[in-house]
Amino acid sequence: SRKAVQALNLFGAEHCVGDRAEQDYTGKVLVLSPDTLKESCWSQENQLWYAHDGFGCSPHTIGRSVRCTCLGDGEMTRWNRNEFIGVLDDKFLPEWAKPKLAELQAQEQTDAPTMGGMNMK
């Protein structure tokens, strides 16, 4: 229900930037659709995910899976590209999410050079 979503100040399409169909999600903060979450899990903390990689990051591949980390609790998992509303506009990034985001971005930079072979599972 729209009202419940608004009451919880959940993120929606109005907080996202760019054309979803054309965006590469790699390294972006993504907004998970509330429809994907159980209602008991509805919160901004559970909606913001940092996208690492996965075929689903690219808009024109057949694969849909995006490997990402939750900015709320640090859980890493895979979601499908279509389960995200889009890329969060930086200006809506909450204060609580900034340290986690900075940490994940720093990790990406340290990890990058050592990833010689693509380790596809």
Locations of the language-model features?
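Intrinsically disordered, low-complexity, compositionally biased regions/tails
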Residues: C16, E22, V31, S58-H60, ...
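Basic/aromatic-rich interaction segments and small domains that mediate binding to polyanionic partners
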Residues: P34-R81
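Composition-driven detection of intrinsically disordered, low-complexity segments
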Residues: L8, Y50, A112-T114
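Intrinsically disordered, low-complexity, charged/polar segments
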Residues: T69-Q109
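Generic N-terminal leader/processing signal
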Residues: S1, T26, W96-K98, G117-N119
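Mixed-charge, Lys/Arg-rich low-complexity intrinsically disordered regions
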Residues: S1-K38
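Non-Sec secretion/translocation targeting segments of pathogen effectors
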Residues: A106-K121
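Extracellular, surface-exposed passenger/stalk and repeat segments of large secreted bacterial proteins
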Residues: S1-A4, T26-G27, S33, G63-M76, ...
